[in-house]
A protein has these predicted regions:
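Conserved AMP-binding/adenylation subdomain of ANL enzymes
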Residues: 3-23, 27-131, 141
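Active-site glycine-centered loops adjacent to acidic/histidine catalytic or metal-binding residues
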Residues: 26, 149, 172
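Residue-level signal for inorganic ion chemistry
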Residues: 68, 149, 160
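Alpha-helix/helix-capping structural signal
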Residues: 73, 150-151
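Phosphate- and divalent-cation-binding pockets in alpha/beta enzyme and binding domains
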Residues: 77, 97, 155-156, 177-178
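Active-site loops of AMP-binding adenylate-forming
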Residues: 152, 161-165, 173-183
Length: 183
């Protein structure tokens, strides 16, 4: 039943062409197990396993996952690394403006609002200069990110949504064998 639940809850992810998951969370983590089963339930899903995260970024680029599961700290590190790489000068200011624009874009989408032409142009500009680089660090085929294990800061979820990586959040208890909800 957990496999059926996983494929139903995450149907958009597992119906993606050739879904690929690179898993580094322990399988004792119920959402990791759940999302792994969603991949396996797909006709052509592939799951890769990492024993630790020491080589995570090169492994992401070589494995080319279509979605990634992590705990909030992983996504905080991705954001902080991108911010740090941008630096303190004009690139740093550009990154901060792009990050705020991504969060605003996500909030507008969530509220069902239409962006203005100026907002659309700004978003496309940041796509070309910032967003594709952040996504590229997670692998060239990444389409979704999933988070479980602890509450994720809302602004961080909006950042990933706004750069074109829908954030799936899982909630549940290991004792129940599966997440209670995935949004």
């Amino acid at each position: 039943s957990i496999t059926i639940s996983a494929s139903q809850a995450l149907h958009e992810v597992v119906l993606d062409d050739h879904p690929r998951l690179l898993l580094f969370l322990p399988l004792a983590h119920c959402f990791a197990r759940f999302i792994q089963y969603a991949s396996i339930a797909s006709d052509d899903g592939v799951v890769g396993y990492l024993p630790d995260t020491k080589t995570l970024l090169p492994d992401l680029r070589s494995f080319e996952p279509t979605y990634l599961l992590g705990v909030p700290r992983v996504f905080e590190k991705v954001y902080n690394a991108a911010s740090r790489k941008a630096g303190m000068g004009w690139k740093g200011r550009l990154f901060l403006k792009a990050a705020e624009s991504a969060r605003d874009w996500s909030r507008m989408q969530q509220a069902g609002e239409k962006p203005t032409m100026k907002q659309t142009a700004e978003h496309l500009s940041y796509e070309a200069s910032v967003y594709h680089t952040v996504r590229g660090a997670l692998g060239p085929r990444i389409r979704y990110v999933a988070c479980g294990g602890a509450p994720l800061d809302v602004s961080l979820a909006h950042f990933f949504n706004g750069i074109g990586l829908p954030m799936i959040q899982g909630y549940g208890m290991t004792e129940t064998a599966a997440p209670f909800a995935a949004t």
